[in-house]
Amino acid sequence: MFTIALAQLNPTIGAIAENAEKIVTAALQAQARGADLLLTPELALCGYPPKDLLLNPSFVEQLEEELQWLAEKMPPSIAILVGTVTPHHQAERQGQKKLWNSAVLIEQGQIKQWFHKCLLPTYDVFDEDRYFASAAKSEYFIYKNVKIGVTICEDLWNDEAFWGQKFYQVNPLMDLIDQGVNLVVNLSASPYSCGKHYLRESLISHSAKRFNVPLIYVNQVGGNDDLIFDGGSFAVNSQGKIIGRSPLFQEDLALLSYDLSSGELTGQKLASLPMVDTEELWQALVLGVGDYLHKCGFSKAILGLSGGIDSSLVAAIAVEALGKENVLGILMPSPYSSDHSIQDALALAKNLGMNTQTIPIGPIMATYDQALVPLFQDAPFGLAEENLQSRIRGNLLMAIANKFGHLLLSTGNKSELAVGYCTLYGDMNGGLAAIADVPKTQVFELCRWLNREQTIIPPSVLTKPPSAELKPGQVDTDSLPPYDVLDGILGRLVEKHQSPQEIINAGFEREVVLKICQLVQKSEFKRRQAAPGLKVTDRAFGSGWRMPIAQAFHPQGS
């Protein structure tokens, strides 16, 4: 019997020396707990995804140097399989990819073997074919007379029996089975979307049972730009039963035992999963906000508090991620702000224990109005004047953030961002859009969940009609359909890629569907200039959304 440790790590992209130290620490801890073999996530040495850092030769050189340092620092009694980038030295032909996405085996202070990723994803947020060469097949190493097959992330996602179709021509897992492996490990950096860990476990359990081989899956954890990695590393036996699992959204070192006589895995820990999707989503957003600030060098956040539900939720997330003393809320009431909204904002801040400052914007609005009289003359009050209020607020928030070194959190939700119900250089200002991938209906669900044990979000915030309060008596439904209808349409259009006619056939009014489709298309220029938003659904308006701005395509049925 030998013991395998799964190091579920939270690397910082480009912090190569720091990441190497983290791996050494994990190895020493694993050795102290009796482990013989340590597994890290995909590209653990540089962090995933490194993107165009890979085009910098010095980045790759530093990775090579740190890999050698890592080998020298490894305890001699433990072997390690570490995810990193390695040069493709045979890539001499001009234009051929010169890098591998690799797993490197280190034993007794020596680099013994290299394993390269076969399947390179190019969908959604992935663009690996831009940088890496694709290996012809997966390979194995022998450890204590056990053939251990090595795969990297996507290599396990081509089980045609599970999906009902093949996505790639080769199946690395099947290649390893044909080579007679006894155990398969997978080094992964699989980004989070709500409920995705269930899909991973279902897929890998199915594959283990299909091929009668135990499988180990070790995932990255932490936030890197718009992506959140949820961890949840796990192992299954040859019958497809999960026998060990690390917790979601935190670093972990889990141990497994491999029985040489039975050829089976046994686990020492089976972490429970969140009871509801809302709890899981909350944990993801908290991790994403905290890591984004810390990895960008910020310790404090600022946001505008309007008394509405979106800013209330973002404030609660920020306080949980950073601590109440590190979050500042700014109230900026205008002549159109209701008294109850001001009181709701103050009540929220009191419930969270965070500090606030109030800056009435009426005098600034008057100055703008006076300056624009020669141009606007007698034109009636309209959208330009409404947006000026938002831009005044955005300007004030950026000034305060700039003055004190805080990061400004944008508070817009996915529903608003989709249809452009937001103001460029106004409420869209910020360094991070915390809930930009959370639909409005889910914002309400999160706030109700937060209030399950004690009142954090003031009850009136949950019951009053949503409003931007940029003119007298304004409510969101003056411009948009009810949010349950809007989110139903957007979910089908954005995440399920349905055509307007398919959405209409699902029971939505034709006129409403066509209006929403048009708004989504016309608002691309706003999304292109938005702050980075944390991805929590299968399709976000982030790095995986690549729509043109100047375009005239209209789907059939529209």
Swiss-Prot record:
Positions with a binding annotation for L-glutamine: Y123, S190, K196
Highest rank taxon of the organism: Bacteria
GO biological processes: NAD biosynthetic process
Binding site for ATP: G304, L305, S306, G307, G308, I309, D310, S311, T411
Keyword ATP-binding tagged: yes
Residue numbers binding deamido-NAD(+): N387, E416, K526
Protein name as catalogued: Glutamine-dependent NAD(+) synthetase
Region Ligase: start-end pairs: 284-558
This protein's record includes keyword Zinc-finger: no
Domain CN hydrolase: 2-262
HAMAP family given in the database record: NadE_glutamine_dep
GO cellular component: cytoplasm
Record SUPFAM superfamilies: Adenine nucleotide alpha hydrolases-like, Carbon-nitrogen hydrolase
Biological or metabolic pathway of the protein: Cofactor biosynthesis; NAD(+) biosynthesis; NAD(+) from deamido-NAD(+) (L-Gln route): step 1/1
Family: In the C-terminal section; belongs to the NAD synthetase family.
Enzyme class: ligase
PANTHER family in alphabetical order: GLUTAMINE-DEPENDENT NAD(+) SYNTHETASE (PTHR23090:SF9), NH 3 /GLUTAMINE-DEPENDENT NAD + SYNTHETASE (PTHR23090)
Entry's EC annotation: 6.3.5.1
Catalytic activity: deamido-NAD(+) + L-glutamine + ATP + H2O = L-glutamate + AMP + diphosphate + NAD(+) + H(+)
